Amino acid sequence: MGNNVVVLGTQWGDEGKGKIVDLLTERAKYVVRYQGGHNAGHTLVINGEKTVLHLIPSGILRENVTSIIGNGVVLSPAALMKEMKELEDRGIPVRERLLLSEACPLILDYHVALDNACEKARGAKAIGTTGRGIGPAYEDKVARRGLRVGDLFDKETFAEKLKEVMEYHNFQLVNYYKAEAVDYQKVLDDTMAVADILTSMVVDVSDLLDQARQRGDFVMFEGAQGTLLDIDHGTYPYVTSSNTTAGGVATGSGLGPRYVDYVLGILKAYSTRVGAGPFPTELFDETGEFLCKQGNEYGATTGRRRRTGWLDTVAVRRAVQLNSLSGFCLTKLDVLDGLKEVKLCVAYRMPDGREVTTTPLAADDWKGVEPIYETMPGWSESTFGVKDRSGLPQAALNYIKRIEELTGVPIDIISTGPDRTETMILRDPFDA
């Protein structure tokens, strides 16, 4: 039995993690975010009602679940307050269900200003960040000048630390980026206005999780973004600023790494990517447009159109290695309905003619990579909302089986629609 289950993306994000976390939390006592910030966009559809969460864990809609934001998350007080209000206006008692680590770094206005100024300065080489201050906040954390939730317990000392760090960053904004300085007093006043709310939710997350483990409670760890955006293992520099792989669970929450029981990789039935960076199977033809339209591939956070392409099992195998995946959840299978043929990338042809079955590391090494495809028959029947494996067309079953063969990982869950009911759980991670 797996008490501590990790749910993470195996591609470039947007795989459909939020729905699956929400579905599986029916049995969980805690749901923990361990990396990223409000650059995530996790969409839940319950009884036709849509909820998009950016910072708060996807378990917040369940009254029997405690949601936790771990130390690996960079926390924007403004974004958290906005999200809390939206949920509370719908009658969800967020403050009764949400806890925070005091070690969460804070994202403040100057981080957002730095993010946008830096992207503007990069010009054509822009990373394609969400412009929410995520990277600069992680940068401050690593440079050991960042302010954390725990600093809010001592308001006088917080004000002094804030003044010092803002002098540093405003000098950078004005003199290097030729941008406007950020107003110190406004940042201080805005942060102090919500300080007591934030500190009232603080808990020792590592200790809480260890006690939960000893009791045998079920805990779900909710990843954001995707494996191929990992700061260390992704398509650097076109990556996010945190560890999106399973290793981030231990560092971002304080759970001992040996206590992770099951790692569920969310796998979209085709590939998408937002922003710049390598994407060997990207389609620029009518099939690419079909996938975008049928899959409604527009970012929940930015509204940007996602780039679309065939499923890349070479890249997915890298995710299998990095995360020691226990099983997959295949999402958006129904988007492929109606295609005469479907393709799987099974290898890459490098510029020198070599065929390889592992991904390069740095983004520059992906240049000139050509996908080698295996073509399979498509299916005309609808898979939307199918709740039993026997109801799937044979061609869809063949596609599923081939993915399992190419990756060496079983598909334990199949999602056939956005609602939590439109799901087949072939093997429950908490029972694995």
Swiss-Prot record:
UniProt cross-references to SMART domains, sorted A to Z: Adenylsucc_synt (SM00788)
Pathway field: Purine metabolism; AMP biosynthesis via de novo pathway; AMP from IMP: step 1/2
EC class name: ligase
Binding site for IMP: D14, E15, G16, K17, N39, A40, G41, H42, T130, R144, Q225, T240, R304
Positions bound to substrate: A300, T301, T302, G303, R304, R305, R306
Residues engaged in binding GTP: 13-19, 41-43, 306, 332-334, 415-417
Keyword tags: Cytoplasm, GTP-binding, Ligase, Magnesium, Metal-binding, Nucleotide-binding, Purine biosynthesis
Cofactor note text: Binds 1 Mg(2+) ion per subunit.
Cited InterPro entries: Adenylosuccin_syn_GTP-bd (IPR018220), Adenylosuccin_syn_Lys_AS (IPR033128), Adenylosuccinate_synth_dom1 (IPR042109), Adenylosuccinate_synth_dom2 (IPR042110), Adenylosuccinate_synth_dom3 (IPR042111), Adenylosuccinate_synthetase (IPR001114), P-loop_NTPase (IPR027417)
Biological process (GO), any one: 'de novo' AMP biosynthetic process
Binding site for Mg(2+): D14, G41
One MF annotation (Gene Ontology) recorded for this entry: GTP binding
Active site positions, chain numbering: D14, H42
Subcellular location(s) per record: Cytoplasm
Matches recorded under Pfam families: Adenylsucc_synt
Gene3D superfamilies: Adenylosuccinate Synthetase, subunit A, domain 1, Adenylosuccinate Synthetase, subunit A, domain 2, Adenylosuccinate Synthetase, subunit A, domain 3
Catalyzed reaction equations: IMP + L-aspartate + GTP = N(6)-(1,2-dicarboxyethyl)-AMP + GDP + phosphate + 2 H(+)
EC number: 6.3.4.4
Cofactor: Mg(2+)
GO terms for cellular component: cytoplasm
Family annotation (SUPFAM superfamilies): P-loop containing nucleoside triphosphate hydrolases
Known partners and oligomeric status: Homodimer.
Family per similarity comment: Belongs to the adenylosuccinate synthetase family.
Protein name: Adenylosuccinate synthetase
Species assigned in the record: Salmonella choleraesuis (strain SC-B67)
